């Protein structure tokens, strides 16, 4: 079933940790919805900042947010102006003290979400779906990926019948739990309708650690 399930969810508690690191006996639902509001606001506010994922930790009346991005300068802004605006907005949104930590992604071509979003943007600019997939694969393998698979589906090239085309290079062992596999999907809005983009990137094997194993229990 490794080819059906989300590769990230399958590995939580084995080699991956949770992106929401908190527990609540009461008000769990309201805190979960607050997390969703925070993530949605950050996605909308930082659409051009190449944000890969957001980690949220809670302690008493404080929220610690880690933003993983390929463009930290755009998130922080000149003299920290942009991150201060973001912090103030999240403070008012949650009525809690918010601390933001910006973490730079140094190899953006090995991050599945950033690769998928880049392919989607190029498709919206009417680039060839074959060319953009092959270019993404070449860049990822050149920078150190062990394997990569991409898939674009929909009315490709304006065809009347929707179909899916995928390209791959190297190996992507979806059944191996210790395999560090990034997965993401994105959508491209074209004149012929939406195109779906999926990306799997295999970055090598990771040995399970005690902390991540306990986090899955």
Curated annotation (Swiss-Prot):
<dbReference type="Pfam" id="PF00189">
    <property type="entry name" value="Ribosomal_S3_C"/>
</dbReference>
<dbReference type="GO" id="GO:0003735">
    <property type="term" value="F:structural constituent of ribosome"/>
</dbReference>
<comment type="subunit">
    <text>Part of the 30S ribosomal subunit. Forms a tight complex with proteins S10 and S14.</text>
</comment>
<keyword id="KW-0699">rRNA-binding</keyword>
<keyword id="KW-0689">Ribosomal protein</keyword>
<dbReference type="InterPro" id="IPR009019">
    <property type="entry name" value="KH_sf_prok-type"/>
</dbReference>
<comment type="function">
    <text>Binds the lower part of the 30S subunit head. Binds mRNA in the 70S ribosome, positioning it for translation.</text>
</comment>
<protein>
    <recommendedName>
        <fullName>Small ribosomal subunit protein uS3</fullName>
    </recommendedName>
</protein>
<feature type="domain" description="KH type-2">
    <location>
        <begin position="38"/>
        <end position="106"/>
    </location>
</feature>
<dbReference type="GO" id="GO:0022627">
    <property type="term" value="C:cytosolic small ribosomal subunit"/>
</dbReference>
<dbReference type="InterPro" id="IPR004087">
    <property type="entry name" value="KH_dom"/>
</dbReference>
<keyword id="KW-0694">RNA-binding</keyword>
<dbReference type="InterPro" id="IPR036419">
    <property type="entry name" value="Ribosomal_S3_C_sf"/>
</dbReference>
<dbReference type="GO" id="GO:0019843">
    <property type="term" value="F:rRNA binding"/>
</dbReference>
<dbReference type="GO" id="GO:0006412">
    <property type="term" value="P:translation"/>
</dbReference>
<dbReference type="InterPro" id="IPR001351">
    <property type="entry name" value="Ribosomal_uS3_C"/>
</dbReference>
<dbReference type="InterPro" id="IPR015946">
    <property type="entry name" value="KH_dom-like_a/b"/>
</dbReference>
<dbReference type="InterPro" id="IPR004044">
    <property type="entry name" value="KH_dom_type_2"/>
</dbReference>
<keyword id="KW-0687">Ribonucleoprotein</keyword>
<dbReference type="Pfam" id="PF07650">
    <property type="entry name" value="KH_2"/>
</dbReference>
<dbReference type="InterPro" id="IPR005704">
    <property type="entry name" value="Ribosomal_uS3_bac-typ"/>
</dbReference>
<comment type="similarity">
    <text>Belongs to the universal ribosomal protein uS3 family.</text>
</comment>
<dbReference type="GO" id="GO:0003729">
    <property type="term" value="F:mRNA binding"/>
</dbReference>
